[in-house]
């Protein structure tokens, strides 16, 4: 495997969305269907830095920073999932994206799947990895992270850990990559959240993960898009790693059998942030898959 690059060689782009500025990467040719890359918690478009160069020679690549994250503005919001839905919906409309191919991860997957379910005629394909799905019981949450995430979802304790101690950036992120992240990479991920006041999204997201039936509104929403995925013929490309976190190998095998029109790719060793362990394979497989989309 080639050395994993730490640089972010993309010019900044900004668009006003609901009165706030959202930052995004925008590279590649303007003709054809754009590829929309959606990150999750606690990352940004930086997560896609080594994947986009594989796709940009043939397709327009757009990678926003979710509101309150990366280089996007940080308005005073509760940062519920519905807040991110509003801003992402408006972002897609502001850029005039009629049809897209989605490349999605973590909470970006929930946002992407939810958008696709509501706009199926505008989705040409979905590439996904380590995505948000219903977790029926805490026993099915990875053991190494169980106590940590239970603490995150305990009112005052969770806020102290994530807001005051920055535990999602300093703890969860590096522990969910097989290789050691460099200080340069860690500093890129730290930069948007140097001030505790800016860490609200990092705290809200783990409290919205649909585990053991809570929170009920997110469980219902995620179950709805999972039902849609199991019925939709849209081409799907699922990346998985070993041991994985949200999508362990056994779950990937089940999904390969149950999802229509789904190709799977084993990236080898990987935890949650697969893009940091094998970006070249992910990027090259997306680039190989795209020409086959109708």
Swiss-Prot record:
Gene3D superfamilies documented for this protein: alpha/beta hydrolase
This enzyme catalyses:
1-haloalkane + H2O = a halide anion + a primary alcohol + H(+)
**Keyword check for Protein transport:** no
Q: Which UniProt keywords apply?
A: Hydrolase
Q: Name one Pfam family in it.
A: Abhydrolase_1
> Which GO cellular component terms are attached?
membrane
Q: What class of enzyme is it?
A: hydrolase
What GO MF terms are annotated? haloalkane dehalogenase activity
Q: What is the purpose of this protein?
A: Catalyzes hydrolytic cleavage of carbon-halogen bonds in halogenated aliphatic compounds, leading to the formation of the corresponding primary alcohols, halide ions and protons. Has a broad substrate specificity, which includes primary, secondary and cyclic haloalkanes (chain length > C4).
NCBIfam families hit by this protein: PRK03592.1
Q: Which PANTHER family match?
A: CIS-3-ALKYL-4-ALKYLOXETAN-2-ONE DECARBOXYLASE (PTHR43798:SF24), MONOACYLGLYCEROL LIPASE (PTHR43798)
Q: What is this protein's record name?
A: Haloalkane dehalogenase
Where does this protein come from, organism-wise?
A: Rhodococcus sp. (strain TDTM0003)
Q: What is the lineage of its organism?
A: Bacteria, Bacillati, Actinomycetota, Actinomycetes, Mycobacteriales
């Amino acid at each position: 495997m080639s050395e994993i690059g730490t640089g972010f060689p993309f010019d900044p782009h900004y668009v006003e969305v609901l009165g706030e500025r959202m930052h995004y990467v925008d590279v590649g040719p303007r003709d054809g269907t754009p590829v929309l890359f959606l990150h999750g918690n606690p990352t940004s478009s930086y997560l896609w830095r080594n994947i986009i160069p594989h796709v940009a020679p043939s397709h327009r690549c757009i990678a926003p920073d979710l509101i309150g994250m990366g280089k996007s503005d940080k308005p005073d919001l509760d940062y519920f999932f519905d807040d991110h839905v509003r801003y992402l919906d408006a972002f897609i409309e502001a850029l005039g994206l009629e049809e897209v191919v989605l490349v999605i991860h973590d909470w970006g997957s929930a946002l992407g799947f939810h958008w696709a379910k509501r706009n199926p005629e505008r989705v040409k394909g979905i590439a996904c990895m380590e995505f948000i799905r219903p977790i029926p019981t805490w026993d099915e949450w990875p053991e190494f992270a169980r106590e940590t995430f239970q603490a995150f979802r305990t009112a005052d304790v969770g806020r102290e850990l994530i807001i005051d101690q920055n535990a999602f950036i300093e703890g969860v992120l590096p522990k969910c990559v097989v290789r050691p992240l460099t200080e340069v990479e860690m500093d890129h991920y730290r930069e948007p959240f140097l001030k505790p006041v800016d860490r609200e999204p990092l705290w809200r997201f783990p409290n919205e993960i649909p585990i053991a039936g809570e929170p009920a509104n997110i469980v219902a929403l995620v179950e709805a898009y999972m039902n849609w995925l199991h019925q939709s013929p849209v081409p799907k490309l699922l990346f998985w790693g070993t041991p994985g976190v949200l999508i362990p190998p056994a779950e990937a095998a089940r999904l390969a059998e149950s999802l229509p029109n789904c190709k799977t790719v084993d990236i080898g060793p990987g935890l949650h942030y697969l893009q940091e362990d094998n970006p070249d394979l992910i990027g090259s497989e997306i680039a190989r898959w795209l020409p086959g989309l109708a």
